[in-house]
């Protein structure tokens, strides 16, 4: 982009914060409401792509300690393990376990394995979408 895109860069900083916050909300709300890992991953991806459009791609990649190719592999492994591990304990494929854990400041928190599965989906979607966009753009904004 040009050096004088002050408005775009300023608005991007605000919009990226909003997108990442909304992505977290959609991810965690997806357990009981519409949303989850896939939609949250798309929202996270759009935040990264917006940063690539507003700023220099190489500067953004240097400032983010994220390798998106490794991110998609880690996400796929997390999802696969979450789906397969219950089989070794005599449960069905993709069996969901849940527990209530007490935290001193938060109180009682409802934790499920589906959240871990959705995290794997989110990481995979972010890794795939951003890798495809970087490949299509040639790593240039």
Swiss-Prot record:
GO CC terms, sorted: plasma membrane
Keyword annotations: Antiport, Cell membrane, Ion transport, Membrane, Transmembrane, Transmembrane helix, Transport
Positions of transmembrane segments: 10-30, 35-55, 70-90, 116-136
Name of one Pfam family that matches: MnhB
Keyword set includes Metal-binding: no
Family: Belongs to the CPA3 antiporters (TC 2.A.63) subunit B family.
Name of the featured protein: Putative antiporter subunit mnhB2
Species of provenance: Staphylococcus haemolyticus (strain JCSC1435)
Lineage, opening ranks: Bacteria, Bacillati, Bacillota, Bacilli, Bacillales
């Amino acid at each position: 982009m040009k050096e004088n895109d002050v408005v775009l860069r300023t608005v991007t900083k605000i919009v990226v914060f909003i997108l990442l916050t909304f992505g977290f909300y959609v991810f965690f709300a997806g357990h009981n409401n519409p949303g989850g890992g896939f939609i949250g991953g798309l929202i996270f991806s759009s935040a990264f792509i917006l940063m690539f459009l507003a700023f220099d791609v190489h500067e953004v990649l240097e400032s983010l300690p994220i390798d998106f190719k490794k991110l998609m592999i880690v996400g796929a492994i997390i999802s696969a393990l979450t789906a397969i591990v219950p089989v070794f304990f005599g449960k069905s494929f993709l069996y969901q376990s849940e527990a209530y854990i007490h935290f001193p400041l938060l109180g009682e928190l409802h934790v499920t394995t589906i959240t871990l599965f959705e995290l794997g989906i989110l990481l995979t979607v972010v890794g795939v979408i951003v890798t495809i966009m970087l490949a299509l753009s040639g790593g240039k904004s």
